[in-house]
Amino acid sequence: MTTLFDVLSNGYKDKKKKSKQLGDYVLDESLSNHNHQTYYNPKDKKLLFNVTGTHNSHDWLTNIKLGLGIGYKESDRYKQSHKALRDAKQKYGINNATLTAHSQGGLTANYISSKGDNVVTLDKATTIGGKSRENSKDYRTNGDIVSLLASTRHNTINLSNPNKQTGNIIYDTLQAHDIKNIKNEKLFV
């Protein structure tokens, strides 16, 4: 089985360091880039689609749009991930996929998923009045500010923060948002 940590951390690696296989899932490089990764399990005929969180300067501009509630679905980031997921479903003849994501990628995964898809996120970016799909499971690290607005939603699972609080608010907040917080958790996708 593949863990959520393995999928998310592989998404942040640069192309040369990305694992080509996670458990029985094989990376489809033709439908992957630095913003999203497509994995197919030929044995079980399952599709896994990961949307990476903020990792470059363009993403920070997208974060501003997200925060203001304008133009997010018009962003290249959103459009590319949406198209890649649809193309992957068509290529593999799959209607229902599992989508994983972290931070900004979590909001994207929520938006691009279909009714039958399962969405599993960590510290998903959330907007005021934003909704989560019924088919999503949103893990949130206590102390994470990006996902704070989702902390009381029915599909949010609040995880304890494994980091020692230093009293430095900026440092502690960044630590709470790190995917390494779930490295030892048994969260399978």
Give the positions of each predicted feature.
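Serine hydrolase/lipase
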Residues: 43-46, 94, 113-189
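Gly/Ala-rich beta-loop-alpha elbow adjacent to hydrolase catalytic centers
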Residues: 100-105, 109
